[in-house]
Amino acid sequence: MRIRVTLYSEFKKYAPGSGSGPFDLNLPPGASLLYCFNHLKIPVNNEFTALINGRRASLYSLFREGDSLVVFPLICGG
């Protein structure tokens, strides 16, 4: 299944390739946010906020085809 991922601030370094802008990620059906973090090598001990389709997610939230994931640190300024 394919999801759209956007990483902000210190999390951008975990994006494949250039790390600039959103990217598509293929995951197995029923994958969780924890699986996604492990796949991208994002340490789970980082303080973060994750939104799936605009709703707050936990590490055990499950993805569905076409979902959108946004990850940013708890404190992030513009």
Features from the language model and the residues they span:
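Ubiquitin-like/PB1-type beta-grasp interaction modules and other compact soluble beta-rich domains
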Residues: M1-G77
